[in-house]
């Protein structure tokens, strides 16, 4: 990694501002300066989010079991299309990905320029909410059945 890269290392995530002989200065997303000893960085896993020009945005979203799968996928597709700055190549991925106790899970994967990652992420979440409402898709809400025993 180099100055200007966005990394996760030694339990810290942020933008590298300086690399010196003894430590690396990282600025977090909430604008805190963190000075991390290079020995901590070198001894652990480093994720460089800036090394490639494009990044994949992954969102796992739930819908209630009472929704038609095709309707949910249609709504999610509409949300992706409505989200600016998503890339068409590689193509977006929208699939049913799991069954939970009270919900069906869907995975959405789209690609964006690294600099657009967070805007695409948050805009897509907002567009999913709008598309669910427009298509009548109901969210997943945990349910509870209570059985009352009658006194005899």
Each language-model region and where it sits:
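Soluble accessory domains appended to multi-pass membrane transport proteins
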Residues: 1-89
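Solvent-exposed, non-transmembrane regulatory segments of membrane-associated proteins
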Residues: 49, 63, 67, 77, ...
């Amino acid at each position: 990694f180099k100055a200007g890269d966005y990394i996760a290392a030694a339990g810290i995530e942020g933008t590298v501002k300086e690399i010196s002989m003894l430590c690396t200065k990282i600025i977090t997303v909430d604008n805190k300066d963190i000075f991390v000893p290079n020995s901590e960085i070198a001894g652990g896993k480093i994720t460089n989010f800036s090394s490639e020009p494009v990044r994949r945005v992954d969102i796992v979203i739930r819908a209630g079991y009472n929704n038609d799968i095709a309707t949910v996928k249609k709504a999610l597709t509409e949300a992706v299309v409505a989200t600016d700055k998503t890339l068409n190549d590689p193509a977006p991925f929208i699939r049913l990905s799991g069954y939970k106790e009270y919900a069906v899970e869907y995975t959405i994967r789209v690609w964006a320029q690294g600099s657009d990652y967070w805007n695409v992420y948050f805009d897509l979440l907002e567009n999913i909410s709008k598309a669910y409402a427009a298509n009548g898709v109901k969210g997943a809400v945990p349910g509870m059945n209570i059985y009352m025993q009658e006194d005899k």
